[in-house]
Amino acid sequence: MAIATINPATGQTVQTFIAHSQVEVNAKLDLAQETFQSFRHLPFAQRGQWLRKAADILEQRRDEWAALMTLEMGKSIPQAIAEVNKCALVCRFYADKAEEYLADEVVTTDASQSFIAYQPLGVILAVMPWNFPFWQVFRFAAPALMAGNVGLLKHASNVPQCALAIAEIFQTAGFPEGAFQTLLIGGKVASELMADDRIQAGTLTGSEPAGASFASAAAGQIKKTVLELGGSDPFIVLEDADLDQALKVAVPARMQNNGQSCIAAKRFIVQASVAEEFFQRLTKAFQALKVGDPSLSTTDIGPLATPDILADIVAQVEQTIAAGAHCRCGGQALDQPGNYYPPTLLTDVPPNAPTYRQEFFGPVALGFTVDNLEEAIALANDIPFGLGASAWTTNPENQQKLIRGIEAGAVFINGMTKSDPRIPFGGIKRSGFGRELGRMGILEFVNAKTVWIA
C-alpha cells in the first residue's frame, strides 16, 4: 500500500511512501517488547535527560518541523511554530514532574506498611490524527515514556513525514530505537494490532467511528484504552459578559487550525439582549481573516487538510442553510486550487436541521440565541459530545451554575478552551474517556499496584 503526502494548498503529491509489511510490523513489535524489559528499569533521571534533549531538538529545528506540518496538513506557519513550542513545553514538564507524580504513595491502613507503587504497563499503541500532528503525539509520548512504557505510533495516513520525523527526534535525543517507533500502516491494521499479545494498552485521538472501532478491538482482549474523540464545544455569552474580550477570544477559539480542532468553539450560544451585536461583530471579525497560502506568516486560514474534509464541510453548510439557517458570511468553497473554505457563520440554526448535533470540522461556526442561563446550559448539553466549553459572564453565581451544569470534560470561564500540560484533558459522552496531561495523564499509562505488608 502506498501512502502519499499531498499538499492541501495545491493538491499536488509531494512524496510517496510504502506501508510497512506484516514482517516489518512484527519486527517493530518484537523490538518494542524487548526494549521495554530494560527501558522500564531506567532511572527517571535518564529518561528525563533524553526527553529534555528531545525538547531541545524540537526548538533547534523548529522551522523545519513547522514547515513539515504546513506542507502535509495546511496549518498556518505561525500556528505550526506555536505547536512545536508547545511540544517542547510538554517534554520538559514531564521530565520535571514524572518522578514526583509516580513516587510510591503511602496509605494508612491496618498493615505495618502499605502503599501504592506505580509501574509501567508495557508496549502502548498510539493512533493519532493529522490535525495537530506533533502535539497530539508528544502529549501522549512524554508521559508514557517517562513512566517507563514504550510506544508504537500509527499516525494519520496524510502526515507520514511528520510521523517519521517524530521517531527521528526521539532517537536523536538518545532514546533506544525500540522505545518509540512509527508504523506506516492503515487504520484497520491498527485496530487489529490491539489483539496482539505484545501490546498492553492503546490510545486513540480521532473521530467517533474510529474510536468505536479501536475500543471494540481492545475490549475483545480486555485491554485498557484512552480515547479522545470529537467535540462540538459551546461558547456561551451571557448579557453581563465583557463582549470586547469575548469577541477577541471567539475568533481564535473557532478558527484555530483552520477550524479543524476537536476542542474548538463550534456553537456560539448568546443571550438575546446582546446576540445581534455579538453576531454582527463576529461576522466582521471572520470576514477580516486572510485565507491563503499557509506557508506565509500573514495567512490566518489555510486549506482544509483533505478534499474529503472540504466536501463534508460543503455538504454540512448546504444542508444547514437549506434547513433555514441564516448565512452571515462565507458559505461557499473558494474557486481556486487547494482545499480552501472561508470563515463561515450560520445563525438561527433550527433544531430539525440534520446538522444540528453534528461536529463541523472546518472554519464554520453555528450561532444560537437564548433567553437566559438555564436555556444556555440546556442547549450546550443537547449534543452527544462533551469535550470542552467556554462561558462568558462576570457574575460569580452564574459562573458556578455554568461550571456545575455544563456536561463536559473542561469548562473555561472567560477564557478559551485549551489543553495545558499542567491540567488534565479529556471528555465525556461520545467525546471519549480517560485523561491526558497533568498527573492524571501519566496515571493512565501505569499499573497502580497496591502493596500491603502485614
UniProtKB/Swiss-Prot annotation:
GO BP terms:
gamma-aminobutyric acid catabolic process
Gene Ontology molecular functions: aldehyde dehydrogenase [NAD(P)+] activity; succinate-semialdehyde dehydrogenase (NAD+) activity; succinate-semialdehyde dehydrogenase (NADP+) activity
Q: What is its EC number?
A: 1.2.1.79
| Protein keywords | NADP, Oxidoreductase
Gene3D superfamilies the UniProt entry points to = Aldehyde Dehydrogenase, Chain A, domain 1, Aldehyde Dehydrogenase, Chain A, domain 2
Note the superkingdom of the native organism.
Bacteria
Record-annotated active site: 228 (proton acceptor), 262 (nucleophile)
Question: Known InterPro entries for this protein?
Answer: Ald_DH/histidinol_DH, Ald_DH_C, Ald_DH_N, Aldehyde_DH_dom, ALDH_GabD1-like, GABD/Sad-like
Pathway where this protein functions: Amino-acid degradation; 4-aminobutanoate degradation
Q: Which Pfam families does the record associate with it?
A: Aldedh
Q: Which CDD domains match?
A: ALDH_SSADH1_GabD1
Reaction it catalyzes: succinate semialdehyde + NADP(+) + H2O = succinate + NADPH + 2 H(+)
Which positions does UniProt annotate for NADP(+) binding?
130-131, 154-157, 206-207, 229, 359
* Function of the protein: Catalyzes the NADP(+) dependent oxidation of succinate semialdehyde to succinate.
Q: Which family does it belong to?
A: Belongs to the aldehyde dehydrogenase family.
Q: What is this protein called?
A: Probable succinate-semialdehyde dehydrogenase [NADP(+)]
- Organism of derivation: Synechocystis sp. (strain ATCC 27184 / PCC 6803 / Kazusa)
Gene (UniProt): gabD
